[in-house]
Amino acid sequence: GDLPGVKYEDIIYECYGPNGVAIILECLTDNKKRTVSEIKNILSKSGGNLGESGCVNWMFEKKGTITISKDDIEEEKLFDLQIEDFEVCDEHYILTTTPDNFGDVSSFLEKDNVNIEGEVGLVPKNTVEISNNDSSRVLNLMEQLDDHDDIQKVHSNFEII
């Protein structure tokens, strides 16, 4: 539970990682100075840095993302949904919706007994391609940020090729 007298703040940090990767961190902290100091330290060790407010936010847009198993639905049914796009993967589909349509699409699928995993979050408008050789630095940074107690969500725009 919460400790009496401790106030938590939601904070968004915009950062650059190695290879020009854009990163947005959604944080919840009781000590902004400690959190920003720890984030700067993690970033600098990986060749990244903390940016100014607004420096990478424009590279992302809010979207609903829903992942469903191919076994749960026929591909033709996807065209009847209020989705913007869908991606076909090995064993599942990844659906993209507007934030406004996310709830309706999720409810429709659940009524049809389709198991869903989904959320409304920040999706990159474009991605930065990272070669397999350069990927370890970026993946290591993402893991360190993800493991930080005050960081609730990590959004980035890289794609390993």
Task: Please give the residue ranges for each predicted region.
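Translation machinery proteins
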Residues: 1-24
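Structural signal for hydrophobic packing residues in well-ordered secondary-structure cores
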Residues: 3, 43, 47, 113, ...
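A general structural motif
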Residues: 4-6, 43-50, 69-76
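Flexible hinge/switch segments at interdomain interfaces of large molecular machines
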Residues: 10-18, 50-60, 113-125
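Short flexible coil/turn linkers enriched for glycine and charged/polar residues
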Residues: 17-21, 30-33, 60-62, 89-91, ...
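Short hinge/gating elements
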Residues: 22-28, 124-128
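Acidic-enriched and Gly/Ser
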Residues: 26-51
